[in-house]
Amino acid sequence: MSTAKLVKTKSSDLLYTRNDLDEKVKLAAIKALNHQVVQFIDLSLITKQAHWNMRGANFIAVHEMLDGFRTAIIEHQDTFAERVVQLGGVALGTVQVVNDRTPLKSYPTNIHSVQEHLKALADRYGAVANDIRKAITEVEDEDTADMFTAASRDLDKFLWFIESNIE
């Protein structure tokens, strides 16, 4: 019984896998997936920053709501990273990579009110939701598109909840 070699072939940038998707489709999907891994890591950290540092009316409701959002975001980021590896790529999720590649605006660390945090979160959730929605139609790997669709549904719901709490 032979086992898969966990080395790159001379003609490919990918690790060996028996997944028979076209290499160009794999490479494009890996690029799109790693982009989302970066955004979702950043969004999860931003969410926790707000969760820890907000004060004011509706604090506990929003505080607890954000915990649920972060849990779902982390699950999606894990799914994306695992798909990268399934396709023969390397998942890129270090703090250094996220810092270098995130398209999200830097999150303000000098805000404190629930309302200020909700507005800052809405901007960033909206940016990621709009970006992943676009990625759904661009990626040619149907499994990756399905993963993006599931994440898009969650982000749209989370954005709705955030916006519904803005006064």
UniProtKB/Swiss-Prot annotation:
This protein's source sits in the domain of life called Bacteria
Predominant place of localization: cytoplasm
| Record's protein name | DNA protection during starvation protein
Output one GO MF annotation: ferric iron binding
Per its record, the protein catalyses: 2 Fe(2+) + H2O2 + 2 H(+) = 2 Fe(3+) + 2 H2O
Which purpose does this protein serve, as stated in its record? During stationary phase, binds the chromosome non-specifically, forming a highly ordered and stable dps-DNA co-crystal within which chromosomal DNA is condensed and protected from diverse damages. It protects DNA from oxidative damage by sequestering intracellular Fe(2+) ion and storing it in the form of Fe(3+) oxyhydroxide mineral, which can be released after reduction. One hydrogen peroxide oxidizes two Fe(2+) ions, which prevents hydroxyl radical production by the Fenton reaction.
| Keywords annotated in UniProt | Cytoplasm, DNA condensation, DNA-binding, Iron, Iron storage, Metal-binding, Oxidoreductase
The terms describing its cellular component in GO are: cytoplasm
Q: How does it assemble?
A: Homododecamer. The 12 subunits form a hollow sphere into which the mineral iron core of up to 500 Fe(3+) can be deposited.
Indicate whether Chloroplast appears among the record's keywords. no
